[in-house]
Design a protein with these regions (language model features):
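Blade-level signature of beta-propeller repeat domains, shared across WD40, Kelch, NHL, RCC1
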Residues: 225-228, 240-268
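Short loop/turn segments immediately following beta-strands, especially the blade-tip
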Residues: 39-43, 86-91, 138-143, 180-188, ...
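An edge-strand/N-cap motif at the start of beta-rich repeat modules
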Residues: 18-44, 267-268
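Structural motif
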Residues: 32-38, 81-85, 129-137, 176-181, ...
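Beta-propeller fold detector
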Residues: 46-54, 93-101, 145-153, 187-198, ...
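Alpha-helical segments with a strong preference for the paired helices of cellulosomal dockerin domains
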Residues: 273-295
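Conserved beta-strand positions in repeat-built beta-propeller and related beta-rich domains
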Residues: 24-32, 75-79, 118, 123-131, ...
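Repeated scaffold domains used in trafficking and secretory/extracellular systems
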Residues: 56-70, 102-117, 155-165, 201-210, ...
Length: 295
């Protein structure tokens, strides 16, 4: 009996102190209809796959945005103004709405990665070709546009990944990592490219995500061999970025041939042993089962 009580106490302690690493949601551009994937930072596996195209809305080759506001995971389409809110842990559908703008925007620009800052959705919008300047699109959480910044005279600035890290706005293009600046000229953005080391040449850069609690910046990329997740250390003074591999995503369940154009971080809840976003009796039972054989 004493041994059983000790085992229960150990399990309860573990329940409150573990399972707090977090999750990264990834887009999967390159199939139709596309899907999104959840990478579990604790287990190192792709453990959830969600197919938004099955819900009856406009289908897309790239469901992206993947921004978390503390309650919902926001998902956007590359080719339509539809926006979705999902359960940030399970990916279950919650609601749908749309940008309050003409869908003609998508005739010349795509929408890609995004983030939420101070109650606004920031989104990377590359042109269909280099003759159209890249755009940083800003809207309210309800989808009402508030601003747009254009990479004028910078055909190299076609943003894909986008993330705020403190007061620094970072974007990726297919081949570079840049820190955005806003000159005095209205509605224009510029950028300084950081010297990125660690990512092999030939990789196409994709989404960015930031874990503020762990001060961890993540980058996803892909080449002909599959997709890779990186952790990036920034040196703003030297304008450098050093990438360290976290995982070969393709070896962990992310399909080969897809491009992770968007990345979104969601914090884990302490004690959530089964990774569903809820802390309940099922989590305690899972911990008891996992450690019961050693008691």
């Amino acid at each position: 009996m004493r041994q059983l009580i000790a085992c229960f106490g150990l399990s309860a302690l573990l329940l409150t102190s573990v399972y707090a690493d977090g999750y990264l949601w990834l887009s999967g551009a390159g199939e139709f209809p596309a899907r999104i994937f959840r990478y579990n930072l604790r287990t190192g596996q792709i453990d959830r796959v969600v197919a938004p195209g099955e819900w009856g809305f406009v289908q897309s080759r790239d469901y992206n945005l993947l921004a978390y506001d503390g309650n919902d995971l926001y998902v956007g389409l590359e080719n339509d103004r539809t926006l979705l809110k999902l359960n940030p842990y399970t990916g279950a559908f919650r609601s749908a709405f749309a940008y309050q703008m003409c869908n003609c925007f998508y005739g010349h620009h795509w929408m890609k990665d995004g983030t939420i800052r101070d109650g606004e959705i920031w989104r990377a919008a590359p042109g269909h070709n280099s003759s159209s300047p890249g755009i940083l699109h800003v809207s309210t959480l309800a989808g009402s546009p508030t601003s747009a910044f254009y990479g004028m005279n910078r055909p190299d600035l076609q943003p894909i990944g986008l993330e705020w890290v403190g007061d620094a706005l970072l974007i990726t293009t297919a081949s570079g990592l840049h820190r955005v600046n806003f000159p005095d000229e209205p509605l224009v953005f510029g950028a300084v490219e950081y010297a990125l080391s660690g990512v092999p040449s030939g990789h196409v850069l994709g989404g960015l995500a930031y874990d503020p609690a762990g001060d961890a910046l993540y980058l996803a990329s892909a080449d002909g061999n599959g997709a890779t997740l990186w952790r990036v250390q920034l040196n703003h003074d030297a304008q450098t970025a050093t990438a360290t591999p976290v995982e070969s995503l393709t070896l962990k369940g992310y399909p080969a041939g897809l491009q992770p154009t968007a990345l979104g971080w969601v914090p884990a809840r302490a004690g959530d042993a089964n990774d569903d976003g809820c802390v309940d009796d099922a989590d305690l039972l899972e911990v008891l089962f996992a450690f019961g054989s050693g008691c």
